[in-house]
């Protein structure tokens, strides 16, 4: 199985915001690190259908995001920065 760059998403997590990048694309997206912002981002990820979403572990700020992605059935990996 071959995975193209467009099928991998990286999310940089901070207390107040999430920076989202799709590999192979220059543009990035921002979302608020709130329940509303995460819900919107999860919906977008469901439409994109990436093969992998890599989320930065940041001492707890990522928990709500990872749970939302996981509950939506999206492939998520939590990695140390």
Regions found by a protein language model. Name each.
Residues 1-81:
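Phosphate- and other anionic-substrate recognition elements at nucleic-acid/protein interfaces
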